[in-house]
Amino acid sequence: MSPQTETKASVGFKAGVKDYKLTYYTPDYETKDTDILAAFRVTPQPGVPPEEAGAAVAAESSTGTWTTVWTDGLTSLDRYKGRCYGLEPVAGEENQYIAYVAYPLDLFEEGSVTNMFTSIVGNVFGFKALRALRLEDLRIPPAYSKTFQGPPHGIQVERDKLNKYGRPLLGCTIKPKLGLSAKNYGRAVYECLRGGLDFTKDDENVNSQPFMRWRDRFLFCAEALYKAVAETGEIKGHYLNATAGTCEEMIKRAVFARELGVPIVMHDYLTGGFTANTSLAHYCRDNGLLLHIHXXXXXXXXXXKNHGMHFRVLAKALRMSGGDHVHAGTVVGKLEGERDITLGFVDLLRDDFIEKDRSRGIYFTQDWVSLPGVLPVASGGIHVWHMPALTEIFGDDSVLQFGGGTLGHPWGNAPGAVANRVAVEACVQARNEGRDLAREGNXIIREAS
């Protein structure tokens, strides 16, 4: 019997509310290699001690409930409880702490991102002892990450499939995102790919609306794709959005895409759901499709500074659930991103091993062992003059996506695509020759044009 069950049996069962910190705050706990570790930014209500707030998070996201229940005596809580093992005040913030919580591996179902999130962030966010709570980072132990398939193909396999090396890949979201007929939509796809882009993309809201049903769009885009491939001699792709109202319909669209022979499909991973995403990722690996992930609705969870969860947590979850590309902010352009922090989670997506580095927002050393990498996608308000900065920041293993930055070209879509391709090749060449992109960027672009 564990010490806990013993005391309970001998003293008799006492109901009533008790402080979480008596059971769940364990500052001398040594974390195990198999524990899932979480860093929460906790803002306790006035009068609630930080230890109690941290312990409350550990309790409510693992075995605890608001009172002592007699069924606690039927299990070994010491084996299954989450533990708040560290607290540190956040510099420059009043009454804000980083609480470190360790969860035993047995609390989680293998291969289920859905269950991991339900457990860790399922019901702690409405907790009344806390004014605000934000999940900043997770450490996923290899013992858990090995139960996931991960990205369908990963960076290296994708480059081999596309036969494109040594430069960032170029994409473009087809605009206007809603209202074009399938035929005109296909025409825009053809012009962009013909001009020199590697990919074009369905906007995340394009599913199957009255003005353009999914099957028509898939057909016309495939036609555009093959025409552009035949004329340029390069392998190209269009992210066909398979997101749908049911998982069955989503898989049906992915199957149709595979039958057309296209290389890549797309999914909105937050609105579609983790479960649907993992199913689609498995289908994609089994059938040789690349999978582009759009994180629509990310800002709902990730935008507030002290509540919700940081994007790097969603990025880690996505690498486990599966996706070959994921949108990751830009550092420049219209969507926000601080440079070091963005680079932090870009590395989490691409690299096998990432050292703890608080200046980049990385709270734990993360070892992905052999899980394939994900290509970060920079998109949102970027255009050709951002190219030197983007090449420097994101490096070769990335997809740079210009929507309005291609289609907004005064001469039309194809010249816009040409401009982007010329710019990226000029930047890569200049970088390889040892020139300073940050300083000479504009000059490099001018020379190229």
Curated annotation (Swiss-Prot):
<feature type="binding site">
    <location>
        <position position="177"/>
    </location>
    <ligand>
        <name>substrate</name>
    </ligand>
</feature>
<comment type="subunit">
    <text>Heterohexadecamer of 8 large chains and 8 small chains; disulfide-linked. The disulfide link is formed within the large subunit homodimers.</text>
</comment>
<keyword id="KW-0601">Photorespiration</keyword>
<dbReference type="InterPro" id="IPR000685">
    <property type="entry name" value="RuBisCO_lsu_C"/>
</dbReference>
<feature type="modified residue" description="N6,N6,N6-trimethyllysine">
    <location>
        <position position="14"/>
    </location>
</feature>
<dbReference type="InterPro" id="IPR020888">
    <property type="entry name" value="RuBisCO_lsuI"/>
</dbReference>
<feature type="binding site">
    <location>
        <position position="204"/>
    </location>
    <ligand>
        <name>Mg(2+)</name>
    </ligand>
</feature>
<keyword id="KW-0007">Acetylation</keyword>
<feature type="propeptide">
    <location>
        <begin position="1"/>
        <end position="2"/>
    </location>
</feature>
<dbReference type="InterPro" id="IPR036422">
    <property type="entry name" value="RuBisCO_lsu_N_sf"/>
</dbReference>
<feature type="binding site">
    <location>
        <position position="327"/>
    </location>
    <ligand>
        <name>substrate</name>
    </ligand>
</feature>
<dbReference type="Pfam" id="PF02788">
    <property type="entry name" value="RuBisCO_large_N"/>
</dbReference>
<dbReference type="GO" id="GO:0004497">
    <property type="term" value="F:monooxygenase activity"/>
</dbReference>
<dbReference type="InterPro" id="IPR036376">
    <property type="entry name" value="RuBisCO_lsu_C_sf"/>
</dbReference>
<keyword id="KW-1015">Disulfide bond</keyword>
<dbReference type="GO" id="GO:0009507">
    <property type="term" value="C:chloroplast"/>
</dbReference>
<feature type="binding site">
    <location>
        <position position="379"/>
    </location>
    <ligand>
        <name>substrate</name>
    </ligand>
</feature>
<dbReference type="GO" id="GO:0019253">
    <property type="term" value="P:reductive pentose-phosphate cycle"/>
</dbReference>
<dbReference type="GO" id="GO:0009853">
    <property type="term" value="P:photorespiration"/>
</dbReference>
<feature type="active site" description="Proton acceptor">
    <location>
        <position position="294"/>
    </location>
</feature>
<keyword id="KW-0602">Photosynthesis</keyword>
<feature type="binding site">
    <location>
        <position position="173"/>
    </location>
    <ligand>
        <name>substrate</name>
    </ligand>
</feature>
<keyword id="KW-0488">Methylation</keyword>
<dbReference type="GO" id="GO:0000287">
    <property type="term" value="F:magnesium ion binding"/>
</dbReference>
<feature type="binding site">
    <location>
        <position position="203"/>
    </location>
    <ligand>
        <name>Mg(2+)</name>
    </ligand>
</feature>
<comment type="function">
    <text>RuBisCO catalyzes two reactions: the carboxylation of D-ribulose 1,5-bisphosphate, the primary event in carbon dioxide fixation, as well as the oxidative fragmentation of the pentose substrate in the photorespiration process. Both reactions occur simultaneously and in competition at the same active site.</text>
</comment>
<comment type="similarity">
    <text>Belongs to the RuBisCO large chain family. Type I subfamily.</text>
</comment>
<keyword id="KW-0503">Monooxygenase</keyword>
<keyword id="KW-0460">Magnesium</keyword>
<dbReference type="GO" id="GO:0016984">
    <property type="term" value="F:ribulose-bisphosphate carboxylase activity"/>
</dbReference>
<keyword id="KW-0934">Plastid</keyword>
<keyword id="KW-0150">Chloroplast</keyword>
<dbReference type="Pfam" id="PF00016">
    <property type="entry name" value="RuBisCO_large"/>
</dbReference>
<keyword id="KW-0560">Oxidoreductase</keyword>
<dbReference type="InterPro" id="IPR017443">
    <property type="entry name" value="RuBisCO_lsu_fd_N"/>
</dbReference>
<feature type="active site" description="Proton acceptor">
    <location>
        <position position="175"/>
    </location>
</feature>
<feature type="modified residue" description="N-acetylproline">
    <location>
        <position position="3"/>
    </location>
</feature>
<keyword id="KW-0113">Calvin cycle</keyword>
<keyword id="KW-0479">Metal-binding</keyword>
<protein>
    <recommendedName>
        <fullName>Ribulose bisphosphate carboxylase large chain</fullName>
        <ecNumber>4.1.1.39</ecNumber>
    </recommendedName>
</protein>
<feature type="binding site" description="in homodimeric partner">
    <location>
        <position position="123"/>
    </location>
    <ligand>
        <name>substrate</name>
    </ligand>
</feature>
<keyword id="KW-0456">Lyase</keyword>
